[in-house]
Amino acid sequence: MGGVRINTELLNGNTAINSNDMEAQGIFANIDHRDKKSNTNLLVGYRHLNIEGGARWFSLKAAAIGKEITKVPSAPEASKNYGFDGLAKESEGYIIALNHEQKMNADWKWFLNAGMNSNKLQRNIIGASSNFVIINDKGDVSNNLMSTQTVTKNYYAQLGINGNIKTGAVNHDVTLALDKAWHSIEGAKNMYNNGSMGSVSGNIYSGLQGNNVWYPSIETGLSSKDQYWGISLADTVKYKKAQLLLGVHKHNASVDSYNKITGRVTQTVGSDALCPTYGFVYQPDEHTSLYASHSENFDKGTIVASKYANAGEVLNPAKTKQNEIGFKYANAGFLTSLGIFNIKQANNIEVYKGSTYLQQDGEQEYQGIELSVNGKLADKWNFMGGLMYLDATQNKTQNGTNDGKTVNGAAKWNAVAVLEYNPDEKFSIVGRAMYTGKADIYNEQLQTPSYMTYDLGVNYKTAFNKTPVTLTAMCYNLTDKNYWTAYGNNLILSSPRTLMLSATFDI
């Protein structure tokens, strides 16, 4: 028993942003085969994407904070094109992934997961540091342009066994796996971001223009390589109303940073770590589940991106630790979940010292509570909602300078509500409201405003020549709200009101 599913993509035209052209071609094939003893899935795909204009990324000039910049300028018109003639991003890539399971007997099986993907950013003509720099409260923009290429390749392989062991009334689901991953990046030997290929100037409210723009040819060189080896063991123990997960992962990693021009290694960072994972679930009755969990992950070391003054530097490896407790309650067609979590990870932040550097300074701690409710309100009416409070702070920073300050770009409040109406089996209407609270940036010196957006859509099920089809019309950002989304210290401009039509054929 098996099947083949093919998804194709062809885009060519303007988006909801003025003079923003997008062209894309893609094809993906998912092939699967199942029999009594095995299960195999193969995914292969290719995609090419070309975007002209329509830049959304901005930043504030760090040296002007508290001087020419005393506030975050109000978001400009989202439908305007804040690019210039020649601004472009073009990429192509492919993916191959294989998953196979083979039964050895009634209780044991072995499995193989392997894959690779490659992506080449062929053209990337944008403001230096990959965004446009706002220099004052009026929204004026001034910075150099840059042109770059990036080639990324990833390889992964995992081999393991999984089986069930019964010891009296206790059931063990045991998994042992070995895995290895390879990753490499090539970058432009010269990005021409020193003004030699031109500059961009203007204002976010009236538009931007490129000045003396020149498009150089780009040659790439090896920027970084890393390798990762790991072994993991996990045991899920089930006994009556209780379930216990015990797991551990041991890894070794090596990260090499290269001089793209000479091809020589400039820095090597090796690491190894033991990361435990454990969790507990207890179901006192058919409606209620109580849970608690702890997990640890290890970052092998962040390689500083080319837009920073310390590009190519490898930041120290660091662990991310997460703890969570909560409960789930299901009754009368509703599922309610409440979780309290704590996450600690390395604090990789932007630091301005004449130029912008990426540095590791202490840790980030995320503490929060998340509530979600979904279910059937009444006949033909469904509801889903969620609310999260997040307290994200910086700790253990150098000399305590930023201790207790909010992590840049982290909003304290987020909420979503979705309402669906199904007048009959063929037709449905869905509405969604999303709220994002205000967020501090630049270590609480500035703040982005809160915003709320609304989406509205309809679905209709029909048939063309006896082939089932679902027609969908969706309007995103229904009220055409203009807003900034904070991402670290960067500002991402919202997308304008966008109408999307689609048809899904069940062949």
Identify the role of each PLM range:
Residues 1-60, 88-99:
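Transmembrane beta-barrel wall of Gram-negative outer-membrane proteins
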Residues 2-4, 37-42, 107-110, 169, ...:
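Repeated loop/turn-to-beta-strand initiation elements of outer-membrane beta-barrel proteins
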Residues 6-12, 42-48, 112-118, 176-182, ...:
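Transmembrane beta-barrel strands of outer-membrane/channel proteins
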Residues 61-77, 131-141, 188-220, 266-267, ...:
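Surface-exposed loop/turn segments flanking beta-strands in extracellular/periplasmic regions
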Residues 99-103, 109-115, 119-127, 283, ...:
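Membrane-embedded beta-barrel scaffold of Gram-negative outer-membrane proteins
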Residues 150, 162, 173-174, 292, ...:
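Conserved C-terminal beta-signal and adjacent last beta-strands/turns
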Residues 152-154, 167-186, 220-345, 376, ...:
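Structural signature of Gram-negative outer-membrane beta-barrels, strongest in the C-terminal barrel
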Residues 241, 340-344, 360-443, 479, ...:
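Gram-negative outer-membrane beta-barrel transporters
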